[in-house]
């Protein structure tokens, strides 16, 4: 990962800037969250199922709303994120709400070697029951083989990995979904200057960001290589979030690309089990 350290540093700076905007945005609606609202969506709640009494490692957790929502569902949670501003905010909210989640500021690629998981009983020795990640995650990672290795390492045998994220086809398109702009396959780093953020496109921030596209074959082969047997795979024509341009909301509350009549997938989910 040494070749990507400058990329990771740029992305960390960007997410620190984003966090300052996101925490006060209507998109995240932190006030409602503090007043008992869950940030989780129907998809992950139904597909992952009951987490009560289970240990859960949340990779790329941002400022931890989903981590804490899983804690409210009865899981013992650890959230990890690259942004120190996001993790500091997560710790503050967690303490304010008197929840039991733990938060670590780290690049997920460092977790295995740096042993940064808190030494809570059973975590290091037996692994986690669940590793969870969702919505805008793996595009920030250059190496999915290493990613899957980390997931497998921290799962106990029989443990579940779950991801809900935006569809690889979506990342091929320009911002208005009018033309193909990027490669479907992970051919090279995508480096761009970004203005604003998805919660407020007019926010007065600019950042250099580095992303990587990943095909389904890359995702699936990485999981299978590291002993993660895929048990469920779903694709969806909608997004639960209004986080892209040119979307419209349906009667079901979900967001779809205007004018495409659900011709294009917008997200997917995978559940895999670590083989004994």
Task: List PLM regions with ranges.
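A short SAM/SAH-binding and catalytic strip from SAM-dependent methyltransferases
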Residues: 129-145
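Class I SAM-dependent methyltransferase SAM/SAH-binding core
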Residues: 55-114
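A short acidic, Gly/Pro-enriched loop at the edge of an enzyme's catalytic core
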Residues: 112-131
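Short alpha-helix
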Residues: 199, 209-233
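Core SAM-dependent methyltransferase catalytic element
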Residues: 226-228, 253-276
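A short glycine-rich, Lys/Arg-flanked "PGG" loop and its adjoining helix->strand segment in the class I
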Residues: 145-160
């Amino acid at each position: 990962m040494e070749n990507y350290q400058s990329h990771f540093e740029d992305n960390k700076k960007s997410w620190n800037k984003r966090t300052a905007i996101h925490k006060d945005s209507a998109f995240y609606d932190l006030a409602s969250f503090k007043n008992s609202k869950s940030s989780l969506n129907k998809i992950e709640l139904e597909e992952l199922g009951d987490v009560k009494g289970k240990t859960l490692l949340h990779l790329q957790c941002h400022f931890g709303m989903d981590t804490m929502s899983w804690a409210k569902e009865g899981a013992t949670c650890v959230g990890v994120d690259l942004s120190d501003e996001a993790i500091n905010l997560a710790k503050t909210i967690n303490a304010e709400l008197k929840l039991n989640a733990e938060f670590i500021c780290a690049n997920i690629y460092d977790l295995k070697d740096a042993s940064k998981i808190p030494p809570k009983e059973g975590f290091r020795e037996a692994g986690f029951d669940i590793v969870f990640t969702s919505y805008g995650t793996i595009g920030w990672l250059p190496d999915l083989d290493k990613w899957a290795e980390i997931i497998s390492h921290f799962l106990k045998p029989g443990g579940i990995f779950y991801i809900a994220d935006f569809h690889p086809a979506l990342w091929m398109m320009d911002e208005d979904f009018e033309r193909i702009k990027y490669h479907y396959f992970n051919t090279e780093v995508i480096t761009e200057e970004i203005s604003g953020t998805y919660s407020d496109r007019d926010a007065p921030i600019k950042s250099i960001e580095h992303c990587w596209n990943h095909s389904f074959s890359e995702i699936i082969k990485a999981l299978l290589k590291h002993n993660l047997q895929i048990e469920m795979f779903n694709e969806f024509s909608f997004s639960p979030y209004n986080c892209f341009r040119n979307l419209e909301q349906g009667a079901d509350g979900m967001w779809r690309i205007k004018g495409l009549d659900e011709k294009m997938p917008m997200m997917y989910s995978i559940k895999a089990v670590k083989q004994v």
